[in-house]
Amino acid sequence: MGAGQSTRSSLNKSSPEELSHVLAHRFASKCFTPLELTHFKDNFNSRALDENGLRHWNEEILSQFLGIPDGAGEKAGPHTDATLDAGPVIFRMVSYLGAFPFQNTLAPSVLTYEAIIKVVVLLTERYGRVLRRGRKDRIKLLFGSLADVGRTQVEEKEMPVQESNDGKANGIAKGNPSHVTGFAIDAPANDDEEEEDDDDDLALAALESLDAIEVFKHDQRIDRSVYKARVSIDTFRRLIALILVIAPLHPIGTTSKLIADQDAESIDAIQAQVDSIIAAFGEEADNDGITYKSFSRVLRTSLPFLFDPLTPLFEHFLFSKNLDLSRRKESRSTEPEHEKSSSTPPPHSPHSESVFLPGPFESNILNTALLSHLSFFLSTSYPLPNLFRNGTRLHPVFSSVYHGESLTAFSHHVLTWHAPSILLLKGVTDSSSSRQDTVLVGAYLPEPWKQSSTTSSDHASDYLDSSKFPCLFQLLPTHTVLLASPFFKTLKFNMPVASFSTKSGIALGCMIPPSSRTSLHHDLRPRPAGGGSLIIDPALENATFVVSDGLNGDGVFLPPGLSPSSSSSFSASALSSTTSISVHAIEVWGVVPTQPELGPVLDPDSSRGDAVAAQKAAWDFEAREAERRRTIHLKVGGGDSEEQTGRALLEMAGIIGDSNYSPRKH
């Protein structure tokens, strides 16, 4: 017991640099396996620079290792695309995160072994193995690594005030003037934002694990009110462009290959998605940058998986080509020339397979950039929601370009798909002005179209599984996500998630008026309800996308920026924005979540995995029935008289004609 108190006392007297060093080694021992740590050390030591005994990485080494473009590097040339030039942004983030949990006083940090250890732990979310109180929430930490902030300057006149509060902490600061002064982004703010009160949970948990809370309090004592921290639009734009490209990346994948595959058309598609995501931050995107309040709100409600691709990117540190055991085994049993061909990482991985399953048509809407955009917010499985991480596959179900603009064709293909699906609609704004903007809207539907969502079972686990909740979204021109109401399963029967008929067309999130003999045609039109809705006319030529500013009565979807957990605090509003769309294409993609990493135990609904086979069986049955109905056996008896009687009956029924009648068999 005495030894424990002595250790706690010595840690409280340690400098931030010493505590940061201790935390890094605790991360290394608790968050990595011995094999992973061996690979990490080899990657670091084989590339590190040595300056007066200090081994570290610089920006160029980091960018080359991660395989990301770096305009500041020696290999930058005239053909280097500035859109994907995220090397300086990543280096800036890493330099900030390497100072954790003392970003105020130690950032930007030199990329030493200890600093990069902490960066990898934070960006791969492995800190839960050490920081029990730490929320799995990196939003503020990531904001701080991206924000443009002034350097903290603690003037002498502020010191007496600080000493009156905690002389011991200031004594540590005075006794250690050698470290560089850091950023002010994580200092306590003089604001009334409730959600920022616990934003330092990760840092607090880190210092609690070291029994060094007093040092942490000193690091957080600098007033942030004089700093207007914002994320530069240019900085954020370059980061989003990179994340869109590397979204399909897996830990042993090749980042440089994903980037090299981008041609001019792909770059244009990426820029369109970047503009859409930036526009989601509202007027701030056109002014001085993005504030923390907007950054946190948008990421929490409509882009929860935006930074997921950084996890496999930084897991590259845990795989060294020099220590690849598979290469060594091959080199012993093959010729020397084969050894060269085995220098690439293992090509087989569930994440490297194509997301698109083979089918009758290729998409006129979906591309790689759009698929990456969908992965930033769409939850297709549980507990791994990201469609690139959980092995989700998309099966082509319906295309208006391929199958025709007909509700009959739509129902034939959609009603035979008994699994979750994604509806996508692309068109242009139908306005009187000469300018027509491209519009792309869609919806994720966890239940088959044939079954009403109001009849689905309501299990307690469904509230934890976001893949069981529908959502309505817009990808162009502005990223918008309308999450499902937590009570959407208990709504009245006339408020289904999705419905369609030959009279009213396709309706998502609408109230469907009851039909009767006295009802006029306009009385049967679906009516927008809740936070938003999508209505497509029966001809599949025009659509209406409605987004409400508040809760417009009961409805399936919530307004943008509102999550199910906070829906009760949102005020009602009758104001809404309506976008009229001239439809160019409609597609429905079946979601086939296959989780090879987790096995079928976590996904007991095996019918979802067999949806492709079930649809094919249904179509084969329909084809056999159609052929059977076309083949009419005229010989109903043993002689010609019975055959003639059967023919006469069929003629009277109007099924066949008598122009080619002959008593003989053909």
Swiss-Prot record:
Residue stretches making up the TLDc domain: 364-592
Keyword hit for Cytoplasm: yes
Residue stretches of biased makeup (Basic and acidic residues): 329-341
Domain of life: Eukaryota
Major localization listed first in the record, in broad terms: cytoplasm
Region Disordered: start-end pairs: 329-354
InterPro entries the record matches: TLDc_dom (IPR006571)
Location of this chain's protein in the cell: Cytoplasm
UniProtKB keywords: Cytoplasm
Gene Ontology CC annotation, any one: cytoplasm
Protein family membership: Belongs to the RTC5 family.
Role noted for this protein: May be involved in a process influencing telomere capping.
Designated name of the protein: Restriction of telomere capping protein 5
Organism of this sequence: Coccidioides posadasii (strain C735) (Valley fever fungus)
